[in-house]
Amino acid sequence: MARVKRGVIARARHKKILKQAKGYYGARSRVYRVAFQAVIKAGQYAYRDRRQRKRQFRQLWIARINAAARQNGLSYSRFINGLKKASVEIDRKILADIAVFDKVAFSALVEKAKAALA
């Protein structure tokens, strides 16, 4: 049987991992064995955090809406309930934007929610 020499393939694999680890600190960017572990871990964090990002943004939007609603004399849950009863279909992302950048429009939405609750 012919001898299989894998130098080219191994070099390519190592280069690929070291390229992905570029910018990492110390041995994590220079030593293949350490860089491989760092790249695998980074991938796990990236996968997890892509899912967490969605949760964190929703939390941020809710916190902003709650703060703005309370300034207008209504709690978050009652405000959302009022909007649903008034059949206003604006998602939390847009509501948070309105709360931050257009306080007059947000106050009008709060009044609409209050009217629907009464």
UniProtKB/Swiss-Prot annotation:
Sample GO molecular function, one term: rRNA binding
InterPro entries: Ribosomal_bL20 (IPR005813), RIBOSOMAL_L20_CS (IPR049946), Ribosomal_protein_bL20_C (IPR035566)
GO BP term, pick one: translation
Gene Ontology CC terms, in alphabetical order: ribonucleoprotein complex; ribosome
Any Pfam family the entry gives: Ribosomal_L20
Keywords: Ribonucleoprotein, Ribosomal protein, RNA-binding, rRNA-binding
CDD domains according to UniProt: Ribosomal_L20
Role noted for this protein: Binds directly to 23S ribosomal RNA and is necessary for the in vitro assembly process of the 50S ribosomal subunit. It is not involved in the protein synthesizing functions of that subunit.
UniProt xrefs under HAMAP family: Ribosomal_bL20 (MF_00382)
Protein family membership: Belongs to the bacterial ribosomal protein bL20 family.
Protein name: Large ribosomal subunit protein bL20
Biological source species: Yersinia pestis (strain Pestoides F)
Gene: rplT
